[in-house]
Amino acid sequence: NVEIHSSIPVAAGLGSSAAVVAAVAKAVSHLLDVELSKEDILSITLESERLVHGTPSGIDPTITTYGGVLLFRKGRGSTRIDVKEDIPLIIGDTGIKHSTGELVSMVRQRRENYSSLINPIIKAGGKTALNAVNALKNHDFTVLGELMNINHALLCAIGVSNVPLDKLVNASRAAGAYGAK
């Protein structure tokens, strides 16, 4: 039996399920005196996420396994981004639980129904991420914040937000945050 104690909210979009699976895989490997590579842990975590969420992107297992700041591209793996200074982040929790599997399914359905509208939004999200990498490399947190704001608007456009989250994002911006999503 495994008992988990965590201050990370469950079903809040913070990748806690991937983190738990990776941690348990590592712990069990130590108990059994079996060496697991990071690739092994990633594979186990990805399979677990597939069982629970259907067809997730793989970003949570990848970041959980390798840590740090990564540029993730589904099907192309990840690239480590060397960030020299700490980035001040605040995580707000609306208390609303959601299912990653249901969100993935909803976005997939919207892509099928409205591909000419949704696909460019998703492509813009990818371009936003690439611009964010440049902002991180240049230590330009103002631009990074603007890109977070753009990304949140894109997520809203495909239906991956809710009123309480939008209120939290707006309150963060009003309080002086460079960006929020």
Question: Where is each model-derived feature located?
Answer:
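C-terminal nucleotide
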Residues: 34, 43-53, 61-181
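Anion-binding (especially nucleotide phosphate/pyrophosphate-binding) glycine-rich loop
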Residues: 1-44, 165-174
